[in-house]
């Protein structure tokens, strides 16, 4: 059962300008420690590092849309974090207000699955999020 679908498309150059202007203040406000660490591993290639941030920014926007709130009503940027499963597949971890919203939307007795697709092709980055409620054990 699909709970929500969200998508977002962002210009990577826009993210680069915000990082240039606000630096760590922006990065610390928007991204989780794990997301910043992922981008830091790509620091030797500035375009790749900025694209990493842009894809994660788009994922947060898409996830907030799938939750039906956008970035408001107690759902904040750092409540949504992009993680990679052991297989390499990207997914999202929700905390705080985003997790509370997800719990409100999830029917009793079902588990949540968050599918995430990320892509970039300079100068654009895109994310799609599908949040589903599934029978336990069918993740």
From Swiss-Prot:
GO terms for biological process: fatty acid biosynthetic process. It catalyses: apo-[ACP] + CoA = holo-[ACP] + adenosine 3',5'-bisphosphate + H(+). Mg(2+) binds at residues 8, 61. It is an enzyme of class 2 (transferase). Gene3D superfamilies: 4'-phosphopantetheinyl transferase domain (3.90.470.20). Its EC number is 2.7.8.7. Keywords: Cytoplasm, Fatty acid biosynthesis, Fatty acid metabolism, Lipid biosynthesis, Lipid metabolism, Magnesium, Metal-binding, Transferase. It comes from the Bacteria. One of its GO terms (molecular function) is holo-[acyl-carrier-protein] synthase activity. Belongs to the P-Pant transferase superfamily. AcpS family. Transfers the 4'-phosphopantetheine moiety from coenzyme A to a Ser of acyl-carrier-protein. This is Holo-[acyl-carrier-protein] synthase.
């Amino acid at each position: 059962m699909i709970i929500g679908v969200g998508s977002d498309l962002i210009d990577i150059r826009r993210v680069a300008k915000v990082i240039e202007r606000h630096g760590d203040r922006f990065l610390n406000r928007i991204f989780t420690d794990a997301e910043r660490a992922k981008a830091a591993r790509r620091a030797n290639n500035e375009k790749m590092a900025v694209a990493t941030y842009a894809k994660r920014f788009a994922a947060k926007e898409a996830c907030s849309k799938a939750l039906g709130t956008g970035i408001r009503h107690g759902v904040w940027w750092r409540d949504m974090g992009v993680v990679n499963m052991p297989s390499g597949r990207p997914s999202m971890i929700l905390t705080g207000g985003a997790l509370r919203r997800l719990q409100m939307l999830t029917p009793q007795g079902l588990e949540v699955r968050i599918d995430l697709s990320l892509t970039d092709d300079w100068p654009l980055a895109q994310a799609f999020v599908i949040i589903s409620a599934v029978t336990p054990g069918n993740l």
